[in-house]
């Protein structure tokens, strides 16, 4: 155990496995909801002055305001720097985009030398392939829906939804073609449903056929 103290810094690792969500409170009072398949790391030196966390996956944050100490979320795409606010960050390594939705307060996106300040109601998306960042205004409350056990998206493709459902329910969902995956729609469900009920609801919304064998689900037109 003495080896632990010889190193400069150790990290606490907080994980939500596939099929589960977790909630935690950090030492500064900040509350974090971690979505399925996500990992949050922070230094054992995390305190009132050093407020930095590393996120792989998706988390919804309610950050305690500290006048002189910024709170930083580091992701694979950019850093989100805040004072005190409510926001959602999604940065799964397997996804092609990194997104931030700001519900309340102010955050700043840092990518290399680039700085972008966000205001409530804004949604920022980084395309990891091109490096392009886009900013839009939409109903950002949908981005915290998962932390309240709801599935709610105003405009989502089947491919995007399937990636989220696979993590949330710990299943393998395959799409027959890119064409099926490109279908766009709006969906609003209570997240208490089983994956079977979610698939049944999807078939009501868009013209698809779903086959299921245990954890494997196949979707075609």
Model-inferred region functions:
Residues 2, 6-221:
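A residue-level detector for the "anchor" residue at the start of short, highly conserved motifs
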